[in-house]
């Protein structure tokens, strides 16, 4: 797919201040050091300012404070990275679905599929499902009974929605994602695990994105709920009954145990793990590989574990950690000895 758009049109779309030729053709996007004629780029971080001198881009998105650093055509905006994000969709080569149903798709007689939806090859849509206008469902996807997909949703090939999954508007779900699988629920009877039926569903709000091979389990009783604007990276596990607040983002390999509640506008970096039945308040940032074992009630940044260091230093640190209990006992003895001597000295001076 190729697209050509005038620089002036981009300026109008962004509400940017245009400096240069409004009729210049823009045909693509590229990084500042790689952009060539016809491509627009951006300067978001000061360490890349050095590339402005030799930039070959047709135009650059700049903050007004950086305008004097570049003599070429530019669009001046408060946040160049955000502006780049907004115009990136003009140049997205992702194929657009064509309205209609592929002849190999299998659709239940009582399923409701809007004529403006695009249903790919070998898709299965079960009884009672409802597919809204503008939805694209990629090849070999499975939509279970009574599922609902809101307007403008985009499901890549090989997405699986078990029964009773409800999805809001403009949701993106990548290949291999499974929504509504059975939660991990068992009761122990004298050492034997008895399965608990998972009778809840999964509910996603509007503008949610779900990454490749991410799993969101159905609730045991009520639905597992993902709020509006939530962004989930690849290979994330969200267990039954979890609730995620609006506009929270999670990087790859996050694991969230059952019945945990995460607030709004939180960020969880890669590999974070959370135990079950805890609450995370709004506005929390959790750094990579952190293990969260209790509720967080105050906004802010949280970490656990040790950061990377040279292997030899790490081995020494690990060896010291094994001795920390012994070191603590020795320190307590020293403190008591010092306290005894101090008390004796005080008594002597008083006498």
Swiss-Prot record:
Pathway: Bacterial outer membrane biogenesis; LPS lipid A biosynthesis. One of its GO terms (biological process) is lipid A biosynthetic process. It comes from the Bacteria. It is an enzyme of class 2 (transferase). One of its GO terms (cellular component) is membrane. The active site is at 240 (proton acceptor). This is UDP-3-O-acylglucosamine N-acyltransferase. It comes from Pseudomonas savastanoi pv. phaseolicola (strain 1448A / Race 6). The gene is lpxD.
């Amino acid at each position: 797919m190729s697209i050509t758009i005038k620089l002036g049109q981009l300026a109008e779309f962004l509400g940017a201040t245009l400096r240069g030729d409004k009729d210049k053709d823009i045909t693509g996007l590229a990084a500042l050091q790689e952009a060539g004629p016809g491509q627009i780029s951006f300067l978001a971080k000061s360490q890349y300012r050095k590339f402005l001198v030799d930039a070959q881009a047709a135009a650059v998105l700049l903050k007004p404070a950086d305008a004097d650093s570049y003599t070429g055509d530019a669009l001046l905006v408060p946040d160049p990275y955000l502006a780049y994000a907004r115009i990136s969709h003009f140049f997205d080569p992702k194929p657009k679905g064509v309205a209609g149903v592929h002849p190999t798709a299998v659709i239940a007689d009582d399923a409701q599929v809007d004529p403006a939806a695009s249903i790919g090859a070998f898709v299965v849509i079960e009884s009672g499902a409802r597919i809204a206008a503008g939805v694209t469902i990629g090849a070999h996807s499975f939509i279970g009974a009574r599922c609902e997909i809101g307007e403008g949703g985009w499901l890549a090939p090989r997405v699986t929605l078990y029964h009773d999954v409800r999805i809001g508007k403009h949701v993106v779900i990548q290949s291999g994602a499974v929504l509504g699988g059975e939660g991990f629920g068992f009761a122990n009877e004298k050492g034997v695990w008895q399965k608990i039926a998972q009778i809840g569903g999964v509910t996603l709000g509007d503008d949610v994105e779900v990454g490749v091979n991410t799993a969101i389990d159905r609730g045991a009783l009520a639905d597992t709920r993902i709020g509006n604007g939530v962004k989930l990276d690849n290979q994330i596990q969200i267990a039954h009954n979890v609730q995620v607040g609006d506009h929270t983002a999670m990087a790859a390999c996050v694991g969230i145990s059952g019945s945990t509640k995460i607030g709004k506008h939180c960020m969880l970096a890669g590999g974070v793990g959370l135990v079950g039945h805890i609450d995370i308040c709004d506005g929390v940032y959790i750094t990579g590989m952190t293990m969260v074992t209790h509720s967080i009630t105050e906004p802010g940044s949280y970490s656990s574990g040790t950061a990377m260091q040279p292997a030899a230093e790490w081995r020494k640190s690990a060896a010291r950690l094994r001795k920390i209990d012994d070191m603590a006992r020795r320190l307590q003895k020293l403190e008591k000895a010092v306290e005894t001597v101090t008390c004796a000295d005080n008594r002597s001076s008083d006498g």
